[in-house]
Amino acid sequence: PMPNIRTIKNFTTSGLMLSPGYGGGTANIEYQALTGMNLANFNDSLIVPYQQLVPNQSDPYSFNQIWTQKYGESATTAVHPFQQSMYLRNIDYKKFKFSYLYTCDSEEPLTHTGTIDRSPYVSDSEAYQNVLDLINEQKDSDKSQFLQLVTMQNHTPYGDYYDNNEFVEADTSENISDSERNDINTYAKGVNYTDQETADFLDQ
């Protein structure tokens, strides 16, 4: 379902990442990506760093601070098309020294929040457009910027969200429940949308 991304990988620097989860609970993966800290280094009692660790740290490190140190506090911005309090991101991103976290319910909310068909989540196309707006705001500046985007389009649960889902007919999986089959079909179509939307985003 992702031919564009696979093609892009063949023509640029790319690799594989072993993810400890998908579709949900991704705040832990987000924490590891932003800080470089593997959760395996912590005690097993640490389940969600965003809720248990970062709010209690006085000066936690994250990679975006490289930009903050060089270009000033306005050089790093985050976008998450959901609620700001989820996983305490509104607290944690301030700790990480992001200048602003744009969410659906932030004081200055996201402009683009459209969905696809019956999906309850903001589409990746809309999420990318919010990022493009931030890029275009700074296009005449000589300062580099760090933009963090955490999307929601392919988050669980996977209902019957999409019309004209070609993966329903293509699914030949055996020995799975109807619920599992529906999850697979919806996830595959969501990834397919992400694939096209990512290609469109990079073209811009």
Regions found by a protein language model. Give the residues of each.
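Solvent-exposed soluble domains appended to multi-pass membrane proteins
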Residues: 1-204
